[in-house]
């Protein structure tokens, strides 16, 4: 490897999951109504192998996406809690769902952009000092996705 100037190591992982959501919009749109998608999430993580020889454990990614699968994803702005239920008030509607069927995200809306951001933040919580970059892409359909990239401080900075 005499001629090698640098090495970049990156892992890639992808998974589909089914979830429903609705959007807060100031204009009339079908997306204001509860609807679902078969999302596809793609994750790329750049870094160096840790003491176990991994940049990041794929099992953490699988468990994270399992929490979203077949759930209703809502913004924390729209909810209140009542005896094991989540009450969701939005767009002149009130939904009462068991807590186990809802994922409440700490974002102002439930767009693909904010879902990607939420996923990237959960990955960051489990990332070691060996991770340099986290990229998350969330596809709502075969034609459209949102992507976020987190560039992390180098070790010891």
From Swiss-Prot:
The protein's Enzyme Commission number: 4.1.2.50
Pfam families (UniProt xref): PTPS
Binding-site residues, Zn(2+): 21, 35, 37
InterPro entries found in the cross-reference section: 6-PTP_synth/QueD (IPR007115), 6-PTP_synth/QueD_sf (IPR038418)
Catalytically driven reaction(s): 7,8-dihydroneopterin 3'-triphosphate + H2O = 6-carboxy-5,6,7,8-tetrahydropterin + triphosphate + acetaldehyde + 2 H(+)
Active-site residues per Swiss-Prot or TrEMBL entry: 31 (proton acceptor), 70 (charge relay system), 140 (charge relay system)
Cofactor: Zn(2+)
PANTHER family (alphabetical): 6-PYRUVOYL TETRAHYDROBIOPTERIN SYNTHASE (PTHR12589:SF7), PYRUVOYL TETRAHYDROBIOPTERIN SYNTHASE (PTHR12589)
Other remarks in the entry: The active site is at the interface between 2 subunits. The proton acceptor Cys is on one subunit, and the charge relay system is on the other subunit.
Similarity remark: Belongs to the PTPS family. QueD subfamily.
Stated name of the protein: Putative 6-carboxy-5,6,7,8-tetrahydropterin synthase
């Amino acid at each position: 490897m005499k001629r090698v100037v640098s090495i970049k190591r990156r892992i890639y992982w992808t998974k589909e999951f089914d979830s429903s959501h609705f959007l807060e919009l100031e204009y009339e749109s079908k997306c204001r109504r509860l609807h679902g998608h078969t999302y596809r999430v793609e994750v790329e993580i750049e870094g160096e192998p840790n003491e176990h020889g991994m940049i990041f454990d794929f099992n953490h990614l699988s468990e994270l996406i399992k929490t979203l699968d077949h759930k209703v994803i809502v913004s924390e702005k729209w909810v209140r809690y009542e005896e094991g239920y989540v009450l969701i008030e939005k767009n002149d509607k009130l939904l009462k769902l068991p807590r186990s069927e809802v994922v409440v995200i700490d974002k102002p809306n439930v767009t693909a952009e904010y879902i990607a951001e939420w996923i990237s933040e959960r990955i960051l919580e489990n990332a070691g000092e060996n991770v340099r970059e986290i990229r998350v892409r969330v596809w709502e359909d075969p034609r459209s996705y949102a992507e976020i990239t987190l560039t992390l401080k180098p070790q010891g900075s």
